[in-house]
Amino acid sequence: MTTHSANTPEPLPPPLAARIRLAHAYFQHIADAHSIDVLHIKGYAFSQEIYRKGRYSSDADLLVRPSQVDRFVKILLADGWRIQAHFETGSVFEHAMTLYHASWGLTDIHRFFPGLGRHGDYEKTFDRVWAARHTRFIAH
């Protein structure tokens, strides 16, 4: 345990951009450890040509395989995350929920993406998007 004397200032929290980028790595680690398929979407997951320098993201957005969303959320809740908005109350499309963690900040967990696929067909839609995924370093 680290202790601080009266003369030692408390460490500064990491900048928001660093915390969000590292949150993406954290989520990938959790997903890999539990064999859950996640796609990092929006924000820092976009290429730098699209997500231009000087623009900042305030959360980490994930698209999770629909059949694995409940298990992924349970794992996150057990790791200290709290629900800010449920699927049913967070969006008119009921496609995403928002979680908060005191260290990591906010994340939006998407179970589908509005406009992609039809109700009841989201697993097949995820398969198509999954097959076209690319690897990108977000936090390094």
Segment roles from a protein language model:
Residues 1-58, 64-140:
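Conserved NTP-donor binding/palm subdomain of two-metal-ion nucleotidyltransferases/polymerases, i.e.
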